[in-house]
Amino acid sequence: MTIEQILEAIENMKVLELNELVKAAEEKFGVSASAPVVVGGPVAGAAVEEEQTEFDVVLENAGASKINVIKVVRELTGLGLKEAKEAVDGAPKTLKEGVSKEEAEQIKAKLEEAGAAVTVK
């Protein structure tokens, strides 16, 4: 197995599977995956900020060209005409959940091009 294949296998694992993998590696090799304590580190109570990896795309409103927005929503979500119209009429509405930053930005660009107001959370 190449390093690339191993990384790909790890990338496709769920959180629970990764946790089990870490525990198994700790037991097998007699090591600990916990971070070492640093003297003089960040002030207690300071939040460690993790980089967000999954994003939600929220349609805030359809703007003036509602028909174009409905067409784009159908294209992006695979919804039928009625469901896409209901999603647009029901704004603010989350259209996509748990997508990568790149995909979220592409979706946002397409919707904004059609005239919609969109946020990525």
Curated annotation (Swiss-Prot):
Top-level taxonomic group: Bacteria
Which biological process terms from the Gene Ontology are attached to this UniProt entry?
A: translation
Q: Which UniProt keywords apply?
A: Ribonucleoprotein, Ribosomal protein
What is a single molecular function from GO for this protein? structural constituent of ribosome
Disulfide bond entries: none
| Any one GO CC term of the record | cytosolic large ribosomal subunit
Cite the SUPFAM superfamilies for this sequence. ClpS-like (SSF54736), Ribosomal protein L7/12, oligomerisation (N-terminal) domain (SSF48300)
Task of the protein: Forms part of the ribosomal stalk which helps the ribosome interact with GTP-bound translation factors. Is thus essential for accurate translation.
Entry's family note = Belongs to the bacterial ribosomal protein bL12 family.
> What do we know about how this protein assembles, alone or with others?
Homodimer. Part of the ribosomal stalk of the 50S ribosomal subunit. Forms a multimeric L10(L12)X complex, where L10 forms an elongated spine to which 2 to 4 L12 dimers bind in a sequential fashion. Binds GTP-bound translation factors.
Q: Record's HAMAP family?
A: Ribosomal_bL12 (MF_00368)
NCBIfam families listed in its UniProt record: L12
| Name the record gives this protein | Large ribosomal subunit protein bL12
